[in-house]
Amino acid sequence: MKKPLLIIILFFIISCQNNFEKDVLNIVKSTEIPAVVMGKINKDGSMDFFSNGPSRWDRNDTINEKNIFSIASMTKALGSVAALQLVEQGKITLDEPLDEYLPNMSSIKILTQDNKIIDPINSITLRHLLTHTAGFGYWFTSKQLSDWGNLKKEIGWTENYEPRLFESGTSYMYGTNIDWVGRLVEKISGMNLEDYLRKYVTGPLEMNSTWFNVPEN
């Protein structure tokens, strides 16, 4: 199976441009990274970029800092900032149960290590979600979820969602926790998450080229 195109954007504070480009080329040659854009911020605030590789598998161009990139799980940082703003404003606390805010989340059943389905006992808090200790996983962080298509048939799972993998606060697993944080922000603020982030996070930071959906223009 072909590996997906992996594009990494890194910002380094490096004083020497020649060494900077040499370091980038060495990284590209020593790994399976097909394309990379790297930048450095100079002491005067200016930025220099170095690129290597195509913007897509089927193109003969060179990728650059003006290409559009999917930032994927870096949106977790934005969602976390939004939630912590609400904590600062006293609209939610880190440790109160979220059952009333997100009943659909709280009722998600747990799949044990021996593939038994049990009802959750502990409530989920914002702290659990932010620290990835609420029990949610990904297919690439959980062996059970990686084969979920087959496993759910074996155990007779009929729900249209994936189970949690442990009681909140009892373990750690990188997973879909921040998706629920985004829903919590919407619930408390009464705003669409994209609108909230634009008004209170990306807007004030002048991140004017960051969107949920790329504008037509």
Model-derived features with residue positions:
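Bacterial signal peptide processing site
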Residues: 17-18
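A short, well-structured edge-of-sheet supersecondary motif
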Residues: 25-62, 94, 145-148
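Structural recognition of the beta-strand scaffold that forms the well-ordered cores
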Residues: 37-40, 48-49, 72, 128-131, ...
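Well-ordered alpha-helical segments within folded domains of soluble proteins
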Residues: 78-80, 177-182
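Short, well-structured active-site flanking segments
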Residues: 85-104, 188-216
